[in-house]
């Protein structure tokens, strides 16, 4: 293996072995605390443009299979691992972790201290980083990193460009794709929903003309304020159709109702985040992947907070007081992670049924 460098914006440099595609890339450095589920995480479009560090000490031990993709074309910039398994084994495995990264043109680095990287990000917040081949021109690479401006509106490159159906016999649901995970479609299909997936910039009029029973606002990457057209669409359809928002969809729904969002210091990325439902006191362990959150300060009168994160008390769910609409910051579809909150899809079914009465 050739040597590769991970250069952080604060000047810290980590040297390790090359993994995956032979590319030099720059992105936002984040970390994920999950112990498994690396395939689902890498193929989650919410990691668009990010260099994903796995805190678990060994990654790739069960290879990659055809069933656990959350999107076919992953858009994360690179992966960072302490150790990439050299002898993976699983009955579903189709290729190794390294083969998968090469097939998807994703570079990586192995043999670095991921605990130290995570500590830096926790203390100083998410930052830019570059993954490059080890050369003698480190100062030049550092100056290039400092000068790089990361792209905005990553939803545009994560969303479908054309509408497509996923037919079934039940409730008609329009799924607005901001970078959706396939597991959301699976959960809705399990409930026999007749789905139409549409691009992120689909207008309210186009959605209303489809006469759906409900609208799903999916997860996706980046800053929700970069998608003003979606915020306007939500303003126009709420009250007319039941709405369920997840992750970025939750943030967009909140913005459409006058709430504010903010960039978190290092975000929530993992599968063990405890969330409390305020009405019942119920605790769910949830899968999360977000760097922005809805502010609890000066929350609009029309919204009520339904869920909070146990560790930092951040907003994890809201419900509209007058319209049939609610949203959560976490992923009730899991994939990977616990299925504690999958009942929320059933709540969405009930919301649609009651609205028709």
UniProtKB/Swiss-Prot annotation:
One of its GO terms (molecular function) is carbamoyl-phosphate synthase (glutamine-hydrolyzing) activity. SMART domains: CPSase_sm_chain. It comes from the Bacteria. Pfam families: CPSase_sm_chain, GATase. InterPro entries: Anth_synth/Amidotransfase (IPR050472), CarbamoylP_synth_ssu (IPR006274), CarbamoylP_synth_ssu_N (IPR002474), CarbP_synth_ssu_N_sf (IPR036480), Class_I_gatase-like (IPR029062), CPSase_GATase1 (IPR035686), GATASE (IPR017926). Pathway: Amino-acid biosynthesis; L-arginine biosynthesis; carbamoyl phosphate from bicarbonate: step 1/1; Pyrimidine metabolism; UMP biosynthesis via de novo pathway; (S)-dihydroorotate from bicarbonate: step 1/3. Its EC number is 6.3.5.5. PROSITE patterns: GATASE_TYPE_1. The keyword Nucleotide-binding applies. The active site is at 247 (nucleophile), 331, 333. Keywords: Amino-acid biosynthesis, Arginine biosynthesis, ATP-binding, Glutamine amidotransferase, Ligase, Nucleotide-binding, Pyrimidine biosynthesis. It catalyses: hydrogencarbonate + L-glutamine + 2 ATP + H2O = carbamoyl phosphate + L-glutamate + 2 ADP + phosphate + 2 H(+). The keyword Amino-acid biosynthesis applies. Gene3D superfamilies: 3.40.50.880, Carbamoyl-phosphate synthase small subunit, N-terminal domain (3.50.30.20). Residues 172-357 form the Glutamine amidotransferase type-1 domain. L-glutamine binds at residues 46, 220, 222, 248, 251, 289, 291-292. Composed of two chains; the small (or glutamine) chain promotes the hydrolysis of glutamine to ammonia, which is used by the large (or ammonia) chain to synthesize carbamoyl phosphate. Tetramer of heterodimers (alpha,beta)4. Belongs to the CarA family. Small subunit of the glutamine-dependent carbamoyl phosphate synthetase (CPSase). CPSase catalyzes the formation of carbamoyl phosphate from the ammonia moiety of glutamine, carbonate, and phosphate donated by ATP, constituting the first step of 2 biosynthetic pathways, one leading to arginine and/or urea and the other to pyrimidine nucleotides. The small subunit (glutamine amidotransferase) binds and cleaves glutamine to supply the large subunit with the substrate ammonia. This is Carbamoyl phosphate synthase small chain.
